[in-house]
Amino acid sequence: MKKLLALAVIAPLLISCSSSTKKGETYNEAWVKDTNGFDILMGQFANNIENLWGYKEVLIAGPKDYVKYTDQFQTRSHINFDDGTITVETIAGTEPTAHLRRAIIKTLLMGDDPTSVDLYSDVDDIKISKEPFLYGQVVDNTGQPIRWEGRATTFADYLLKTRLKSRSNGLRIIYSVTINLVPNHLDKRAHKYIGMVRQASRKYGVDESLILAIMQTESSFNPYAVSHADALGLMQVVQHSAGKDVFRSQGKSGIPSRNFLFDPASNIDTGTAYLAMLNNVYLSGIENPTSRRYAVITAYNGGAGSVLRVFSNDKIQAANMINRMSPGDVYQILTTRHPSAESRRYLYKVNSAQRAYRRR
């Protein structure tokens, strides 16, 4: 059965991968059309922002950056999940503090459902939640977490009195307030998904520490994560490459929807299934489990085909070459000779993060 599965899926897998380039080397006409359309949308979106905010002030949502515009693109909330900061800004010419106040409150109290928020419009579709996404990740000036509107409102007023800043972009005055997340904000977010990670780990036989390391590196546990290549969610799965491959292996037709991949449990399941496919099918010819893990990590970012081509254009010969090397040599080659600088850095980042999770 395993061999039959391998035969069924190995061809598309050899030229398709998950989250970097992003990620797939297969020519797929529908995917190209969708990608071109997405590129056009992003270009128009960025142009609208540049016209209002100025060239150096363009901010767009990314894997580790939540950016939401409102008020006809005059106000925006930016959560930088790497730096651990929330910055709310406005260029509104009238009552700027009122615009900031409203945006601060909504950002502090927003839920964790990415399907309910359009990050590529100025529609104010942010819903106040009884279980805010940022609860526990940010505290007010008294050191208390923020769950209710009353506390969020009081904190917003405090911020506007004590932390309001302004600068000029050459066109307009930008008013802003910055809030720091708590020092362990990354762990706070990761904790939300531990149960889902454990379930996927047991289902597909993938180490929990690897799943968590991939999530941290891909999105910093940001469920709203998007990318310039339209990779989606916590594990940055692309619908037309990794998503399609996983669906095919599970006997499903088509591709996962955006809403499906923005659901944390579905995203983690799909991303983990893809890791298992890379390990058990695509890169199964690599015998040493540590060497194979290095290859799987790099392939999740840049494609399995590109990993093997680092060693040989012939995939069987590539596996044989890897099998004659020590894991340390394989790691050294992948982090220095892979043609993609992003993939070289990716292996280092994920491997370092996985070591940290293993020590816990």
UniProtKB/Swiss-Prot annotation:
One of its GO terms (molecular function) is peptidoglycan lytic transglycosylase activity. The keyword Signal applies. GO terms for biological process: cell wall macromolecule catabolic process; cell wall organization; peptidoglycan metabolic process. One of its GO terms (cellular component) is cell outer membrane. It is a lipid-anchor. SUPFAM superfamilies: Lysozyme-like. InterPro entries: Lysozyme-like_dom_sf (IPR023346), Murein_transglycosylaseC (IPR023664), Murein_transglycosylaseC_N (IPR024570), Transglyc_AS (IPR000189), Transglycosylase_SLT_dom_1 (IPR008258). Pfam families: Mltc_N, SLT. The keyword Transmembrane helix does not apply. Residues 1-16 form the signal peptide. A lipid is attached at C17 (N-palmitoyl cysteine). It comes from the Bacteria. Its EC number is 4.2.2.n1. Belongs to the transglycosylase Slt family. Murein-degrading enzyme. May play a role in recycling of muropeptides during cell elongation and/or cell division. HAMAP family: MltC. This is Membrane-bound lytic murein transglycosylase C. It comes from Salmonella arizonae (strain ATCC BAA-731 / CDC346-86 / RSK2980).
